[in-house]
């Protein structure tokens, strides 16, 4: 047996009890007129974008101000001593400068021209007369210095000052070297291609001649065994 529904009086009473103290919601204006929409006077920024006073413009000014502050801080900061004496090369040319320094260092090692700081700071003899007097005097041991020993002490060979190449000249030389290498590879490829085509042409020609000889037939339409035997004998003689 299905459950019976509650009576209408209980239902109405229940809703009435629940809705006590709650105002009824009304949609729209009570007078029936529509309100006109007006923008919010409390905007997030002043002015308008058309006048150039929008939020993007203010943000740009703030970024410019921060950048100027950073520049002033960098200018006022004292330069460190290490930065004054260390060589700073641009990143895209650093490898060229380092390679040039390494080449000069190796050249000095080979020629034996690396002089110590004491030899460089030592003053040279002022007058030739003083050298003659010292050479005429004999040492207490009775040993006379040889002329070769005197020459080695006085003569100092300095490396030839070669003009350093600029980064543009080095880049130009590198470009020319790469272009020459590419041209040599291209020429070699063309030569191999011509040789391969010539070998294929000769091979096809030889095969066609052999096919013409072996494909000949007699008047009755049978293969000509005499020509085939002659061709085989000729081939054996060539190989032997």
Swiss-Prot record:
Coiled coil: none annotated. Residues 104-181 are annotated as: Disordered. Its main location: nucleus. Residues 171-181 have a biased composition (Basic and acidic residues). InterPro entries: Fyv7/TAP26. It is found in: Nucleus. Residues 131-149 have a biased composition (Low complexity). Keywords: Nucleus, Transcription, Transcription regulation. Belongs to the TAP26 family. Component of the transcription complexes of the pulmonary surfactant-associated protein-B (SFTPB) and -C (SFTPC). Enhances homeobox protein Nkx-2.1-activated SFTPB and SFTPC promoter activities. This is Thyroid transcription factor 1-associated protein 26. It comes from Mus musculus (Mouse). The lineage of its organism: Eukaryota, Metazoa, Chordata, Craniata, Vertebrata. The gene is Ccdc59.
